[in-house]
């Protein structure tokens, strides 16, 4: 097939179905943009989770008799417990926090509690950094019930709750993207049907003179995939605009405090090939199936 003929057929299809083509481009842009937003949230959650996991610590709270009578972990019970923790293969580092230090640390983090919280409210504890914070349950189970242990707290459970919100946001974006994708598929199918109908005479003549089915249907496939490519381009541009105008300003303080990972232009460029593949494959497959069902001769 000559490229000039193919280009002319594609441009003719666009001219005859301008409004439907624009609607398909915009619907594809919205669905692909939402899907890309969901992918960015997933990347944000994974990168931020890595930041927090590096900071995660298990805290082994000690009983009242140890907290009240041992400020430097010199007693036999405290030393034995510390040695038991340090000799574990899954432990990376251990530090002792006495009652006064625990109180000072709490007031530093939450100064509003200074007038209502007494020093006796905070037990002494061991702050333990694990080799793999993801596998904290084995450590927690081993520590509970040990002599001198009051309770065990792991920060990873709190982090999991935090990132459950991000997971919910990404799932919501994917769900809306799916609905929009269905709309885009219906528009593509409708556009291909209308384009084939408006050119039915030309197609019939071409078939009579021996043109293959593939020869007559390729312009419709290219038309749909080209429109989808435009939609993906708009979606990627939209993600960059959102990143520049919204995320950069709204999350700047969190970035500076290293509370969450930064969404960069490189992240958007990383997912762009996948978005392009998704958009072109969705449009091409839909157009092909529509032509197979609609144009049977």
UniProtKB/Swiss-Prot annotation:
Keyword Iron attached: no
Gene that this polypeptide is encoded by: ftsX
Keyword Cell membrane tagged: yes
PANTHER family: CELL DIVISION PROTEIN FTSX
Role this protein plays: Part of the ABC transporter FtsEX involved in cellular division.
Residues exposed to the Cytoplasmic side: 1-21, 193-219, 289-297
GO biological process: cell division
Location relative to the cell: Cell membrane
Gene3D superfamilies reported in the protein's UniProt record: 3.30.70.3040
Transmembrane segments: 22-42, 172-192, 220-240, 268-288
Subunit structure: Forms a membrane-associated complex with FtsE.
Regions of this protein lying in the Extracellular compartment: 43-171, 241-267
Organism: Mycobacterium tuberculosis (strain ATCC 25618 / H37Rv)
Example of a GO cellular component annotation carried by this entry: peptidoglycan-based cell wall
Name the UniProt record assigns to this protein: Cell division protein FtsX
NCBIfam families listed in its UniProt record: FtsX_actino
